[in-house]
């Protein structure tokens, strides 16, 4: 049997993953990770957790500790607050300030969970493997989709290196979410009925723009209808708006919904178009960088991609360039492919890796609208 350190988050998924590993006879060690401190990081605006006697992360640790005791495994905790700030959060803020929409979960997996946390588990505890409660499958350094397609998290793991995946176990990869809940309830685990977390845990129920205002000052400007060149509203900061966004525009009295098609940060303008004008949002190829390709054994005629989580697969052709850059073609077109987001590449069930979307195009024209 192996010595396995598992990331215990205080949620039902990692709880069941730890339980299953223990049932299999492994030596299991729970490790709780904290990446955020609201006071240290000046996270004040709209942060209701500051008024609570027990902050959400401490509640999660208590839940994880109760589960560890039930299962009969030790649990430890480790802080990566500075590392998260330096490697993930400053990157996140810089991307927003430059007009991109990054994915913090992918950055956290790349720099913290499967780097700092992974190395700590191996070096501190002498672990043979590191386990997580993700819905994905790692096998011989390769990454595959989780069996439960509605919960598959391979998209978020596209920047994890193959050398790391060789020592990673995802006990839930071959399971449906309903089965995970059933096991938790039958084992009477403390987290059996705990609600699934969504989004970035330390933001809580706040709007993401409210959270960002702690770190990126508001820069009010105008909202411009790209089809008429007329000002139709005002905004608090162009960098807060993402391609394809419909909610939060506060455009009253319009005949139909509008969506964001671009912005000009220098002129402090956000450009929108009516929902019926899909051409302003549709691209058919993209340029991406920072490619992490874990598997070179694939059928180039069978490639598909996801441009965001829980999106349907899109058939693509990929042109591999130098310096970890790629061009990806999808001739039928797709709406709201967003610069800054991750493109995940697949060959059937195998997730080959991913890259960060830099530019999007319709034929020869870059979709970067201005007036």
UniProtKB/Swiss-Prot annotation:
Region feature (Interaction with target base in tRNA): 103-105
Disulfide bonds: 108-201
Organism from which the protein derives: Mycoplasmopsis pulmonis (strain UAB CTIP)
Alphabetical list of NCBIfam families matching this protein: PRK00143.1 (NF001138), trmU (TIGR00420)
Protein name per Swiss-Prot or TrEMBL: tRNA-specific 2-thiouridylase MnmA
This protein's record includes keyword Electron transport: no
Chemical reaction(s) catalysed: S-sulfanyl-L-cysteinyl-[protein] + uridine(34) in tRNA + AH2 + ATP = 2-thiouridine(34) in tRNA + L-cysteinyl-[protein] + A + AMP + diphosphate + H(+)
Organism placement in taxonomy: Bacteria, Bacillati, Mycoplasmatota, Mycoplasmoidales, Metamycoplasmataceae
E.C. number: 2.8.1.13
């Amino acid at each position: 049997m192996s010595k396995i350190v598992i990331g215990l988050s205080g949620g039902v998924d990692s709880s069941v993953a730890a339980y299953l590993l223990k049932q299999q006879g492994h030596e299991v060690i729970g490790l709780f990770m904290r990446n955020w401190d609201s006071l240290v990081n000046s996270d004040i605006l709209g942060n209701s957790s500051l008024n609570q006697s027990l902050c959400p992360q401490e509640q999660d640790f208590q839940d994880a500790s109760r589960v560890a005791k039930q299962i009969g495994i030790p649990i430890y905790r480790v802080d990566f607050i500075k590392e998260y700030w330096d490697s993930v959060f400053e990157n996140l803020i810089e991307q927003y300030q430059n007009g991109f929409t990054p994915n913090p979960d992918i950055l956290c997996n790349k720099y913290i969970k499967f780097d700092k946390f992974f190395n700590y588990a191996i070096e501190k505890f002498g672990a043979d493997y590191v386990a997580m409660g993700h819905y994905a499958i790692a096998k011989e350094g390769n990454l595959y989709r989780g069996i439960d397609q509605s919960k598959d998290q391979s998209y978020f793991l596209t920047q994890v290196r193959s050398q790391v995946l060789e020592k990673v176990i995802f006990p839930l990869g071959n399971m449906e979410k309903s089965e995970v809940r059933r096991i938790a309830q039958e084992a009477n685990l403390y987290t059996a009925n705990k609600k699934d977390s969504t989004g970035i845990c330390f933001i809580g129920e706040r709007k993401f723009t409210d959270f960002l205002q702690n770190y990126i000052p508001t820069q009010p400007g105008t909202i411009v209808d790209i089809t008429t060149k007329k000002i139709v509203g005002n905004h608090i900061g162009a960098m807060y708006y993402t391609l394809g966004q419909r909610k939060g525009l506060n455009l009253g009295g319009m005949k139909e919904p509008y969506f964001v098609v671009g912005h000009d940060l220098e002129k402090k303008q956000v450009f929108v178009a009516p929902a019926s004008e899909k051409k302003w949002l549709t691209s058919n190829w993209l340029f991406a960088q920072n490619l992490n390709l874990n598997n070179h054994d694939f059928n180039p005629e069978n490639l598909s991609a996801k441009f965001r989580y829980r999106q349907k697969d899109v058939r693509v052709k990929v042109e591999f360039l130098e310096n970890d850059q790629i061009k990806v073609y999808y001739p039928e077109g797709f709406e709201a492919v967003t610069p800054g987001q991750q493109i995940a590449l697949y060959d059937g069930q195998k997730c080959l890796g991913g890259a960060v979307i830099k530019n999007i195009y319709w034929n020869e024209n870059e979709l970067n609208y201005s007036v």
